[in-house]
Amino acid sequence: MTRNCSLKAIVLLVVLIGGALPALAQQDRYDERDETVAPEALAQFRKGERLAKNDRLDDAIAAFQQAITLQPDYAQAYHQMGLAYAGGNRYPEAVKAFKEAARLQPQSGQVQENLGVAYIKLAQWREARDTFAEAIRLHPDNAEVHYNLGLANGKLNRDQEARTQFAEAIRLDPAMAKAHKNLGLAYLNLGMLDQARKSLQEAVRLDPKDPQTHYALCVYYARAGDTQAANREFQAVKGLDPKLAAQLTDLMRAGAPAKKP
């Protein structure tokens, strides 16, 4: 596993995606004292909440839409409707609902966060970056949002900015393994190999069952000429994710550029 091929080309297979894509932040239970809501609209909103909780998403969307019809400035209903759309993987509709919620409730960092996640699901990275930046302006101490902004920057090949955001996420939440992993991957892309190794080793310590972290460490050790360590990490990848190990083998053998996920 020590074939001398492009480090950045190999790393691109996993860089700055962090395993599963981000999840949406579920809204806290709505308190009708927060805004003046017509009783009929509130009843439809509550109905939508119950339906969504039971995974009856289409019916929930209809109830939230009815609440909005009764009260067009109902920001919470737009937000919950966006969550219901997202729950059904209907992200274009979710974006529209979250944008309307953000227009009506511009100081809600949670709405901005969920809008950004919906953009990530649609691979609209510039929109995601701008939205997460606004979410951070509203709530600068949210580690998850800093992490998500790092992902968006990474996908835009803004590795320095990505590194900054992952480091901030770690400052706020030192146990966030995925932030350590992606910080390591950003360091790899920047050619900062010693820092990459330290970040990836910390990610493995926090989450030893993440195959992507072992993959990145395998690449690092192969590049450094440490055959024993590279093979150890390769065996870890193989045990956790045989398909990923096969991809790594093919890439190392061919020395060919990897396609971004």
What is each stretch, according to the model?
Residues Q26-V37, Y215-P261:
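Terminal, low-structured helical/coil segments at or just beyond the last alpha-helical repeat
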Residues D34, A41, A75-Q76, G109-Q110, ...:
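Helix-start (N-cap) detector for alpha-helical repeat units in TPR-like alpha-solenoids
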Residues R46, Q80, N114, K121, ...:
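Canonical tetratricopeptide repeat
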Residues K53-Q66, G87-E100, Q110, K121-E134, ...:
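Structural signature of tandem alpha-helical TPR/SEL1-like repeats
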